[in-house]
From Swiss-Prot:
Source species of the chain: Euglena gracilis
Entry-linked CDD domains: Ribosomal_L22
Lineage summary: Eukaryota, Discoba, Euglenozoa, Euglenida, Spirocuta
One annotated GO biological process: translation
Subcellular location: Plastid, Chloroplast
Name under which the protein is recorded: Large ribosomal subunit protein uL22c
Gene from which this protein is expressed: rpl22
Length: 116
């Protein structure tokens, strides 16, 4: 008997100028939760990445509604991932001709939803 693969929808955003460590802290809060509950949690978080993740999650929900005609109440966050993107390297000048490197990190955020 063939098992059916669960219907999944996803959304991703690339080259976000936020450190992946900061984004992962928020993504860990919404993993495994229903989409509606995750949206509510993100709406009231005071952190900068939470607004980006909120918009991305809304996009994933609307992708699921458009592609599979599913209600937002039956969706859950299957996977929430923040991968490291390219690092922008800058130089901060200091005294006596020295210069210290600054790494401006970027990340790629991916959210996958599945039906409960």
């Amino acid at each position: 008997m063939e098992q059916k693969k669960p219907l999944e929808s996803s959304a991703s955003i690339k080259y976000v100028r936020i450190s992946p460590f900061k984004v992962r802290r928020i993504l860990n809060q919404i993993k495994g939760r229903s989409a509606k509950e995750a949206l509510m949690i993100l709406k009231f978080m005071p952190y900068k990445p939470s607004t980006l993740i909120f918009k991305l999650l809304k996009s994933a929900v609307s992708n699921s509604i458009k592609n599979y005609d599913e209600d937002a109440n039956v969706l859950r966050v299957l996977e929430a991932r923040a991968d490291a993107g390219p690092i922008l390297k800058r130089l901060c000048p200091h005294a006596q001709g020295r210069g210290f490197p600054i790494k401006k990190r970027t990340c790629h955020i991916t959210i996958k939803l599945s039906i409960l």
